[in-house]
Structures are given as C-alpha cells and as structure tokens.
C-alpha cells in the first residue's frame, strides 16, 4: 500500500511530528481530500495493475522533480494506492485467486447475488478482501473518491453500476464519463 501526500504542504493538527497517527490537512487547515485507488482485483486484468502502478509512479516522480501540477494536487489530496490486490490471480493469469474466488465479488455489499460468479464461502472469506476492507474502514473510511482499476471492458461504472437507481450526484459521473469519452485515442 502506498500513501502519497505532500507532508510539507499542510499541517498535522492532531499529532505534530507523528506522521502515522495524524490526519493531513491543507495549508488553510481544511482536511485534504482522500482518494483511494486499487488495481489487480482480477489477476488476468494486467492493465488494471499497471494503471495503478503508473498513477503511483507519476505522483512519486512528479513530487520528486517538483512538478507544480503534481505538487498542487498533493497539497490538497492524500492518495492511497494499492497496486495489486490479487497476486495469486496475477501469477496464474486468472480472474480468481488461488481459492478460485472472484475477489471483486467477495465483499459484503450485495454478496452472492450473481449466479455466474465465485463469491467465496462468505463475504470477506478471502484474506485479500478482508485486508482491503480493514484498510478502507480504518485508514480511509471517509475517502472522497474510490477508484478500482479494471480492464475487462471499456466502461465506467459508478454507484451502482448494476442497479437501476441513480446516485444523487449522477450528473457529475456523467460529466466525467463524457470527458473521458471525448479523448481521442489515435
């Protein structure tokens, strides 16, 4: 797990000097936005892992070279990046982990509602999803944005990609989708 932030740009109001036990704030005292990114839920979606790695590399190198755009983002945002969740699946080039469980279906949200998936014996039965859940609930419980990198199809899913209800901020998601789709891939 990588945590990337500009620790010099803000204040550590709870425990100055103890970076592990404090929350990071913008220079104006407001809480930084928190973004959590994970890659490699499905081991055979290698580009999902690579995308998470490239995001981490971009911000680490940009911070190191003093890239002003990167420094501005990191002065206002705390990034948490899990590059590869499913190491077994990556090694065996399969969607599932070594226990033949689809980690993306092993969370407690609508667990075991898809007949065609292998969700595991119970929600969080797999160490990978349990550890990811603990991290998300204990370290980034108030994340402003969660991005999970998948590369099986070219779609953008947002809460909830499977159900007909739209989230209250659906216009924002549609705007992001339209912006991404407007990029030329020639």
Residue map of PLM features:
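Conserved small/polar residues in nucleotide/adenosyl-binding loops
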Residues: 186
């Amino acid at each position: 797990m990588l945590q990337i932030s500009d620790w010099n740009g803000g204040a550590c109001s709870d425990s100055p000097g103890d970076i592990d036990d404090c929350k990071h704030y913008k220079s104006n005292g407001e809480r930084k936005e928190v973004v959590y990114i994970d890659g490699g839920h499905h081991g055979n979606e290698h580009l999902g892992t690579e995308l998470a790695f490239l995001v981490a590399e971009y911000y680490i190198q940009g911070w190191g070279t003093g890239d002003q755009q990167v420094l501005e983002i990191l002065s206002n945002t705390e990034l948490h990046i899990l590059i590869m969740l499913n190491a077994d699946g990556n090694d065996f080039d399969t969607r599932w982990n070594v226990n033949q469980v689809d980690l993306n279906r092993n969370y407690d949200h609508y667990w075991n509602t898809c007949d065609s998936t292998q969700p595991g014996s119970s929600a969080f039965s797999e160490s990978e999803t349990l550890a990811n859940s603990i991290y998300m609930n204990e370290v980034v419980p108030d994340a402003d944005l969660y991005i999970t990198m998948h590369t099986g199809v070219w779609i953008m899913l947002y809460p909830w990609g499977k159900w007909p209800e739209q989230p209250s901020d659906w216009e924002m998601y549609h705007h992001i989708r339209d912006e991404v789709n407007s990029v030329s891939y020639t």
